[in-house]
């Protein structure tokens, strides 16, 4: 069998929904974590430069920002591993479903992979046998997990609910920066507002970013307009928007994973195959 025909047969069993969801998940998490990390750093600089001169006023905020940045590191690592595991689950269950409907058969490629993992002990040294045995044990343990799609449905459902909260929280800084930017637009065009320019302010204390006793805590008028014109403010604003888009993409990917896993599990259950196959 030629390489082209082998690849064509392998593509027949490819879970395209899981492939798209995996790519979207990696893209969304990378965008959310990377842009979110830099946006938090930019926010820290803006606060300590323009909104408060006393370190004690924003010390708690800095600790929270650093904690969120460490959480971002863990989130990126977790989603990379879990996304790869969900993709493997997609291949596993999609192959089982297509075997039920007669649309998928084990190819020579699959047999070759199986032989590579479990067979071919002759002619190997003790080191080669040990490596093959270790790989076989890993694949056996992974197969036990992949043989229970109901677990992945439950875990992915819980993860989707948690990420829905993350998605909602990622909209908060976008809302704050958008309000600040809108105020700056009103200051830049005083003819479009009846309020005095000096009364148009951005108050970090109002959003709980700083305590109420922080000084000055707010910036008004032309000073606020000059802040909005800085590259640092504009970059931070756009980074938060990008992080929000990344959170949305990750949420869509989790929903796609959950729908695909639920469908495969339902088909296997209804066709009398149970959860072990």
Swiss-Prot record:
The record's account of how the chain is modified after translation: Palmitoylated; contains four to five bound palmitate, probably attached in a non-stoichiometric manner.
**What keywords tag this UniProt record?**
Cell membrane, Disulfide bond, Lipoprotein, Membrane, Palmitate, Phosphoprotein, Transmembrane, Transmembrane helix
Natural source organism = Bos taurus
TM helices/strands, residue ranges? 11-36, 60-88, 152-178, 239-268
Q: Which residues carry this modification: Phosphoserine?
A: 114
Intrachain S-S bonds = 184-228, 201-220
Q: Which GO terms describe its cellular component?
A: myelin sheath; plasma membrane
Membrane topology per the entry is: Multi-pass membrane protein
SMART domains xref list: PLP
Question: What is this protein identified as?
Answer: Myelin proteolipid protein
Q: Does the keyword Phosphoprotein apply?
A: yes
Q: Which family does it belong to?
A: Belongs to the myelin proteolipid protein family.
Single GO BP term:
long-chain fatty acid biosynthetic process
Phosphothreonine is found on 116, 118
Q: What does this protein do?
A: This is the major myelin protein from the central nervous system. It plays an important role in the formation or maintenance of the multilamellar structure of myelin.
Compartments reported by the entry: Cell membrane; Myelin membrane
Give residue ranges on the Cytoplasmic side: 2-10, 89-151, 269-277
Q: Which GO terms describe its molecular function?
A: structural constituent of myelin sheath
Please indicate if the UniProt record lists Transmembrane helix as a keyword.
Answer: yes
Pfam family name, one: Myelin_PLP
Question: Which residues are annotated with the lipid modification O-palmitoyl threonine?
Answer: 199
